[in-house]
Amino acid sequence: MREAVRAGIDVQCLPGATAFVPALVSSGIPCDRFAFEGFLPPKKGRQTKLESLRDEQRTMIFYESPYRLLKTLQQFAEYYGGDRQVSVCREISKVHEESVRGTLDEVITHFTATEPRGEIVIILEGCKK
């Protein structure tokens, strides 16, 4: 899967019971160890949660609304560095399914120019130690 993504091949996975499984598999980010984090707290506790994940080595999975996506990606870049790999998947198994992959900085640039829509899953590479 990782090599297909690197080669620029459009990869789509069939969905199961949850949206994060096909998002994880199609991300091209290591999926042998991962942590499902769900939605980040919208306000209270958000910075504490982001800080607590700074040294997480497993791939992390988040759900996010399109209205908070850009802010969340910017916070990830601030806390974890803009060179961390990320995959943002939206509308999994629907007509407008899309995966945007790259560094946090690259994906932030994409979503600054393109308004995000739909149900979103973020796959974030873990910390490399």
Q: What residue ranges belong to the model's regions?
A:
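A contiguous loop/helix-start segment that scaffolds small-molecule binding in enzyme catalytic cores
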Residues: 58-129
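Class I SAM-dependent methyltransferase SAM-binding "motif I" and its flanking Rossmann-like core
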Residues: 1-56
